[in-house]
């Protein structure tokens, strides 16, 4: 829980302009990218919003099979970290290089290393997938997140309930999960795809 709280504190401060929908009183959300792929990473190139806004990414989610997707190494960030709305869907574009990848120490020079990396990436297939979000989260869960956010006094800090969104790269593509995270004891609410 301490780790998640640290992520939450950090994520609420970053990427304040990611969402293409400025909805007053929106739920906002925190995004986590993870991977259960073994021997491959997910090199995220772009994320496109329903509005057509396209974000260029340089984010790589490392591979490695874990007993549970929640234990997979991931990256957490704020997506609509303030009061913005939840997008209907997001289009992801990524490549899957081998993991671990090339190491600079194995090459005679930086130039040789850069050339090898460029050649390796040029041969990779670019994959795409649309992940639906808003329709898969129960309205009452979104309402709880909104209500919790509205009750936060200025300068008080984080709301008691926050919506977390998970994108997990698997051998079968991107899986989607969500949960309503509580800073105090509450009934666990979560849903989405089954992830082996």
Task: Describe the role of every protein-language-model region.
Residues 22-53:
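Short, surface-exposed binding/anchoring microloops in extracellular/periplasmic proteins
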Residues 79-143:
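Mature extracytoplasmic domains of secretory-pathway proteins
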Residues 119-196:
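Compositionally biased low-complexity segments at domain edges in trafficked proteins
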Residues 47-99:
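Tryptophan-paired
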Residues 1-7:
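Bacterial N-terminal signal peptides that target proteins for export
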Residues 39-44, 100-103, 174-176:
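Short, surface-exposed beta-strand/loop "edge" segments at domain boundaries and coil↔beta transitions
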Residues 16-17:
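C-terminal motif of bacterial Sec signal peptides marking the signal peptidase cleavage site
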